[in-house]
Amino acid sequence: MRRLAAACAVALAATVTACSSPKPAVSPNPTRYLGVAGVSMAGLRGFERVTGVRPGIVEIYTTFGDPLKSALLTAIIRGGAKPLVQLEPYHISMSAIAAGRYDAYLRRYAAGLSRLTHQVLLSFAPEANGYWYSWGCRSTSASVFVAAWRHVHDIIAHYDRRIIWLWDVNQSFPRSCAITARWPGGGYVDWVGVDGYLWYPYLTFNMVFASTIVNLRVSTGKPVLIAETGVLNMPKAAAQLKSIFAGAKAIPGVIGVVYSNYATAQHDYRLEKDPSALATFRQEARDYATR
């Protein structure tokens, strides 16, 4: 997540209850993916150059209401990667989405997706178990969130049934809300995404992610993508990167890691700022990723 990440993971409080929909099952490629988030096409080329890795997933962020970034998505596809689109409803009422007030927009968006030559991963309203977004659990009820998520899914899926639907949450932490109530249902989700960052030198992959992933795997049965992660330019950054890849390989059902190679006003996750971390990432990513 780009605004806030928690420091430690805790177990989920309850089992997620699956529900059904008319959506047919999608069979995504089971390849282990290495991805990058938050970069322009020029930034993507730079990432490939310094890491020696061609990402299998490229994650972009879009605001609900904005036109589909067709040219960017086409460029990502032509480069051999799957686009992961984070569709974020800033300043939009989730109740209004659920009630159909934005259906015309969703139909235009879906029509654009259907014209692409390759399957896209799509995440709507990520990290709803956090409190920092208007669609999060302190501002939007679980029932409204689920209704909006399903409505977005149903409108878009009518036009493009190739989409891999990613339900993306923040790693559970003491101030987060229970994930369980915001689960849209197994018929609406193909992959589960988990976001989390190793903000402090003592943190490891298992401390941040393990309990959340294990509980989501048990409760949903869906493949898990580490949809955002990163380390800061600190003395233990290289060791933390090793921890990320080792942890992702060790937990069954984790199918990929997306690294946030960008800087925010508060945090800088760019690998090129730390030669030791960059060298470690180059080696670990090559060992991890297959295409």
Regions found by a protein language model. Name each.
Residues 33-116, 236-240, 247-251, 260, ...:
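N-terminal carbohydrate-binding/catalytic regions of secreted carbohydrate-active enzymes
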Residues 16-18:
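C-terminal motif of bacterial Sec signal peptides marking the signal peptidase cleavage site
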Residues 149, 153-177, 221-235, 259:
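Aromatic-lined carbohydrate-recognition surfaces of secreted/lumenal glycan-active proteins
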Residues 71-86, 191-235:
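Glycoside hydrolase catalytic-domain groove-lining segments
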Residues 109-142, 163-169:
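Active-site groove signature of glycoside hydrolases
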Residues 98-121, 143-159, 181, 249:
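An active-site-proximal structural segment forming one wall of the substrate-binding cleft
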Residues 32, 119-126, 227-291:
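Substrate-binding cleft of secreted/luminal carbohydrate-active enzymes
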Residues 54-63, 179-206, 260-262:
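Aromatic- and acid-rich polysaccharide-binding/catalytic face
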